[in-house]
Amino acid sequence: SPWQQVDDTLTRVDGQNQSCHVVCNPLYSAYFTRPGKDRLTVLGVLYPQAQRTYCLNAEARQLLEHIQLPRATRRCLAQWQSVPGLAEGPFLSRLDAELPRLTAYQRQWIITAAAIAAYHADPLWPVIDTLVCDDAPQFDWLTADVMHCWVHAGRPYKKLTPYVAAHHALRDAFLTRFWDYYRELRTYQQAPTAAERERLSTAFDTLFATHTGYVHLDRLIAKTQAQKAILLRVLEHPELPLHNNAAELAVRQRVRKRDVSFGPRTPEGAKAWDTFMTLADTAKKLGVSFYHYVYDRVSQANQIPKLADLITERAKELGLGASWGTTGRGASTGARTPWAT
């Protein structure tokens, strides 16, 4: 599907803190234990390569508009446009040779922008169009769009601690309207129409134009209003979930595993955790007994189809990318999930 859900949680490998990243949709869950949780790490999860490649094209330069770079640096980077993609070694060597005075922050941004551009420029990889996630910054810029979880958007309101009874009433009244609107979005998903899409867009503006006089509440309302585009992706693509519960539940399984077993002691052990948790959760979503699946593979009976084939078949039935059409990259509902085996 052209959309995926992502989340991460702390894990420990040989007593050292690392991160477990989860990528999922209604048909599978994939676990990846990595040393960090920065944007490049998440990119490596979405776009696994034996050796990362880089591309300083127009998209990379556009991403670099978000930071301040000297004009001389931008002119130097513009000369790289003719290079379609570089392997990591040559890219970093050239970067160090031609721009030795970059700060660590500037260098990291250039590396990240070039890696993201290479991911988007790869014609052979199913590039994800939309990530459903929370508002963690490492998920920004990786895909054309993101959709933030409505449950996460509602949590700051619940965490408000008003000391005045009137403020309590204002918060509770607004939360009631907030979740009423959320339920209207869920209803829209069942039978989307252009008229209802327009009405809900206008209703969002009305709801989050509310001024209560309770300063902290009004600040939260204004913050949510500024996120209209990323909260209302569902109006254009009704297949998108309104919340990220699926990824959070997958993460919670890793937390429970961590509570019982503390953590793997070696990288191989971490890979084994990831592999078996991926298989177990994916089999569950596909209605396959994990016990019978493992027995089938160990006994070499091979009576149960490959999970990847089941995912492809179910994806066609569910139409997870129907509103994107079937001609764009990554939009085909029959595209094979790259992590499933």
Which positions does each model-derived feature cover?
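Catalytic center-proximal scaffold of phosphoryl-transfer enzymes
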Residues: S1-T341
